[in-house]
């Protein structure tokens, strides 16, 4: 089913808007502006995923920083495209990007507590919860998980 899945770094305005839409749909409590997305293109490795011409998901790979020596891998799949193998394929690509950044780094992810599909997916990939927190002004917790 994933044979026609296509991923790319968002470059055009439309691709940036597609990435933004996926993020803001999957993480509705933390909307990003297009300027936020442009910033992420510069700081992180991000991909937008299409099935044919239909946007179905996105990834973010955050490199290690002084504050966090882990590489953070985030996979987002729009609800109507879940349970079809796309998340697994996107995770495989994002994990490869993470290993390119820092082969021996700890791998972490973050999931919104109100996204049970995302939490279940992360746990099936071998991630275990390490922390729950709510950002100032937010009402839904984020869950940090580490690859065991």
Question: What is the role of each PLM region?
Answer:
Residues 1-34, 143:
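Short amphipathic alpha-helix that is part of the acyltransferase structural core
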Residues 43, 67-69, 115, 136-141:
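Short acidic/glycine-enriched loop/turn segments that link adjacent beta-strands
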Residues 48, 54-63, 70-72, 76:
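Conserved beta-strand in the GNAT
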Residues 88-92, 102-103, 112-132, 138-139:
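Conserved active-site alpha-helix within GNAT-family acetyltransferase domains
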Residues 2-3, 132-148:
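C-terminal "cap" of GNAT-fold acetyltransferases
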Residues 74-83, 111-112:
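A short, internal acetyl-CoA/4′-phosphopantetheine-binding micro-motif in the GNAT/acyltransferase core
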Residues 37-42:
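Short loop/turn motifs at secondary-structure junctions and domain boundaries
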């Amino acid at each position: 089913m994933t044979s026609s899945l296509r991923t790319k770094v968002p470059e055009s305005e439309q691709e940036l808007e597609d990435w933004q839409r996926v993020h803001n749909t999957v993480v509705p409590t933390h909307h990003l502006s297009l300027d936020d997305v442009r910033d992420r293109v510069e700081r992180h490795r991000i991909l937008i995923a299409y099935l044919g011409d239909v946007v179905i998901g996105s990834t973010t790979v955050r490199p290690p920083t002084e504050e966090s020596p882990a590489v953070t891998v985030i996979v987002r799949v729009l609800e109507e495209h879940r349970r079809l193998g796309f998340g697994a394929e996107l995770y495989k690509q994002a994990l490869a990007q993470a290993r390119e950044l820092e082969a021996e780094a700890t791998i972490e992810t973050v999931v919104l507590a109100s996204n049970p599909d995302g939490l279940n997916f992360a746990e099936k990939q071998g991630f275990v919860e390490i922390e729950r927190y709510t950002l100032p002004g937010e009402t839904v917790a984020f869950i940090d998980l580490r690859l065991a």
